[in-house]
Regions:
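Short aromatic-glycine motifs in intrinsically disordered, low-complexity regions
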Residues: 21-33, 178
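Short, well-structured beta-strand
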Residues: 5-8, 102, 109-196
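Short, ordered beta-strand-loop transition motifs
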Residues: 26, 45-55, 126-134
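Secretory pathway targeting signatures of secreted, lumenal, and periplasmic proteins
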Residues: 30-106
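Bacterial Sec signal peptide processing site at the extreme N-terminus
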Residues: 1-17
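Short beta-strand-initiation
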Residues: 20, 29, 56, 145-147
Length: 196
């Protein structure tokens, strides 16, 4: 009771990152391929509809040791998709819409900027890959749900969007090292993406 009080600084655990080694995702039924790290696993994404047939080319790249996932969604430019539309009573109904390139780009920006309440900055940078694919990479700063997002397209046939999420309460300081580490993997995925 008579000892001097010593304040304890807030700290975070040291994270030992694995060596960067990549393997190829090249499912013959998919319209794209890319390289991803061996410390991740691929799973089919049915989280939005509980029915993978509505979006059969959407996948998750899961990083179990980091409690993170890159959600990848794919759509055909000019094709149609089923969207959930909110009714006035709060329930949802299915609606079919055309996948125009402009609409998908606007949707990507809108999804990114939904984080502007928590973000204190949002940076976007235009990308051009070695395989003549263009897109935009978003870096968000602040306690946001997803600090890294991107979309890629050839503007005529293919459109792919990715967003990194963690199964944790957003805390920019504690997630910074893992966000930086997985950003390298996202950039590798982007630079190795090929359309089929």
């Amino acid at each position: 009771c008579n000892s001097n009080y010593t304040s304890k600084k807030e700290g975070y655990f040291k994270i030992d990152f694995p060596k960067k080694v990549y393997t190829t995702f090249n499912d013959p039924t998919f319209p794209y391929s890319f390289e991803y790290p061996v410390y991740a696993r691929i799973s089919k994404d049915s989280s939005y509809f509980n029915d993978g047939s509505r979006n059969p080319f959407s996948i998750n790249i899961v990083f179990p040791s980091f409690n993170g996932t890159i959600f990848i969604s794919y759509k055909n430019v000019g094709g149609t998709s089923v969207y959930n539309v909110k009714n006035p009573d709060g329930s949802y109904r299915d609606s079919t819409g055309k996948n125009s390139f402009e609409k998908m780009v606007n949707d990507s920006y809108n999804l990114t900027y939904k984080n502007d309440i928590k973000a204190y900055s949002i940076e976007d940078s235009v990308m051009h890959t070695p395989f003549n694919i263009t897109g935009v990479f978003f870096k968000l700063s602040g306690n946001v749900a997803t600090a890294k997002q991107f979309f890629l397209s050839d503007t005529l046939y293919h459109f792919l969007r990715g967003a990194l999420y963690f199964d944790a309460t957003p805390n920019e300081d504690s997630l910074r090292p893992v966000n930086a580490f997985l950003q390298e993997d996202m950039k590798h995925l982007i630079n190795t993406l090929k359309w089929k």
